[in-house]
Amino acid sequence: MEEYILEIFNSREELCAKYKIDNIKILRLDDEGAKTKLALIKTKNFNLKFIFMYYDMGLKPQLINFFKRNFIILGIQSKIIRIDLENNVIDTLVDFSIIPFFEFLENDSYLIAIFEMGISVINEDGELKWKLELPEILIDWEIVDENIKLFYFDGKIGIHSLKTGELLS
C-alpha cells in the first residue's frame, strides 16, 4: 500500500494555485467560512484521493496509514474518519460533536484517538472498539502497558483499560 500524506491549505485558491486543479470535489465537514481550511489527502506521487473542508479549531488534523489494511484514518475537527481506499468509501467512526480532536497514539493492538474531553479506541481492523466522553478537560496522557493513563485539568488522574474502556483507578 502506498503511503498517504495530509497537506493543509488556507483556501481553495491556495490549493488550486499549487496543484493546478480546476474542478475539484470537496467533501464538506462544515460550511465555507472565515475559519475553514482544506485538508488534501494524496500519495507521495500526487495521486489525489480526497479533499476535506473543515472548520479550523486551531488543531491540525492527523492522518494514520493502516498498512495491514487498505484504509487510512483521519482525525479532524471532532471526528475520526475511516477511508476505505479500495472502494473510496468514507465512514465516520467517531463524532464528539463539539469536542476537538487532539492526536492519535498507537500501540501494538490499538489506535487511540485523544480528544479534549473524550477518548476512543480503534482496533487493528479499523473498527471502533469503544469511545468515552470524559468528565474533565485532558491535559496529558500516556500508554502504560495495556492501559491509558489520563491526566485531567482538575488534577485528577484516571487509568482506563485499552481493551474495554473500563475505569481501573
Task: Identify the residue ranges that each predicted region occupies.
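A glycine-rich, hydrophobic loop/mini-helix early in the fold
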Residues: 44-90
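Short loop/turn segments that connect beta-strands within the blades of beta-propeller domains
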Residues: 68, 76-78, 86, 107, ...
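WD40 beta-propeller blade core
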Residues: 81, 120-121, 158
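Conserved beta-propeller blade signature
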Residues: 72-73, 110-112, 149
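Aromatic (tryptophan-biased) beta-strands that constitute blades/sheets of beta-rich domains
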Residues: 40-57, 89-100, 127-134, 168-169
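Short loop/turn segments that connect beta-strands within beta-propeller blades
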Residues: 85-88, 123-127, 162-164
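Acidic, small-residue rich beta-repeat scaffolds with periodic aromatic anchors
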Residues: 5, 143-169
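Repeated scaffold domains used in trafficking and secretory/extracellular systems
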Residues: 2-30, 51-69, 95-108, 134-147
